[in-house]
């Protein structure tokens, strides 16, 4: 059954926009830098399998996920490109790395030793990427310990260090000084390894913000994430880049009524009409990922005009005021994220009102919102 028919709330995913954004990354970096496209968290809420297949067809050399289980999903869908697991992996997950040919990110000696034993058991050499924590404070070996750590891991007979990586904490901030500090620490590690003649084929550090603002940090490979989906990491980037949002979120009016002045709207009657008003109900709510914090402050698009949310966002429904919009009818299309006529509401607009980031908005659109895919490569 077509989910789109059964529910008048859906997200449209334009895969031609995804390909456009991927090509923008290639244009910035040139042909000598590999691209590992980040598709964790269900491709940032866009649907991982169609997105991953599109990116592979567009030319990405690798894919990155956060947890092994996401890599398993890609393998079971037939994706054969190298897949790296960016997060720390616990012993209970090690078998998945071998069974599904996933590349772990290693920052602990215990992990390296355990993987080496398992690789010997299976009579294979396991590729790994070493994570250096230059200032994120998350996972990874600290810079002053990194050269010795790499030397030790490099001596393991069933481990092949394919990559060395770090992650920038503040590349999307206006003040770039901390990013330069991180870069200097990473370069010192690379220089130390060069002195020992330890060759690591793939060095990588750049996330979306660094790709846009720090081209020289590209090294051998980059890890674009949010920019692939047409969203900028922040408004504080120095360089401009043309990106096309991949996701549009839509719903339809399911109920329409006129109410007199003094009518309370939604839970807690936090909004009370001060005039005769036309109130429309939408079949979408915070269970679908629309932020409840936008109660009485969010807007949607109806017939090319902005309509304010009235009252609290409910779990499954939202009420909007369409008094000023003529000819509104039940069944009219409503845009939550995207464009309608000359008006636009972006994920970033919603994020700013919700005091969060655009990443959280698109990742938070729940699975009960059907995704419709448009403009697939090759049809």
UniProtKB/Swiss-Prot annotation:
**Molecular function GO labels:** alanine racemase activity; pyridoxal phosphate binding
Q: Which residues form the signal peptide?
A: none
User: Which of the seven top EC classes does this enzyme belong to?
Assistant: isomerase
Question: Catalytic activity annotated for this protein?
Answer: L-alanine = D-alanine
GO CC terms in record? cytosol
**One GO biological process from the UniProt record?**
D-alanine biosynthetic process
What are the protein's UniProt keywords?
Isomerase, Pyridoxal phosphate
Give, as in the UniProt entry, the pathway in which the protein acts. Amino-acid biosynthesis; D-alanine biosynthesis; D-alanine from L-alanine: step 1/1
Enzyme active site = 40, 267
- Residues that the record marks as modified (N6-(pyridoxal phosphate)lysine) are 40
- What's the Enzyme Commission number for this chain? 5.1.1.1
Cofactor entry: pyridoxal 5'-phosphate
Q: Where does substrate bind?
A: 138, 315
User: One of this protein's Pfam families, by short name?
Assistant: Ala_racemase_C
Q: Identify the PANTHER family for this entry.
A: ALANINE RACEMASE, ALANINE RACEMASE, CATABOLIC-RELATED
Q: What does this protein do?
A: Catalyzes the interconversion of L-alanine and D-alanine. May also act on other amino acids.
Cite the NCBIfam families for this sequence. alr
Which family is annotated?
Belongs to the alanine racemase family.
HAMAP family xref list: Ala_racemase
Name assigned to this protein: Alanine racemase
Organism annotation: Halothermothrix orenii (strain H 168 / OCM 544 / DSM 9562)
Gene this chain is encoded by: alr
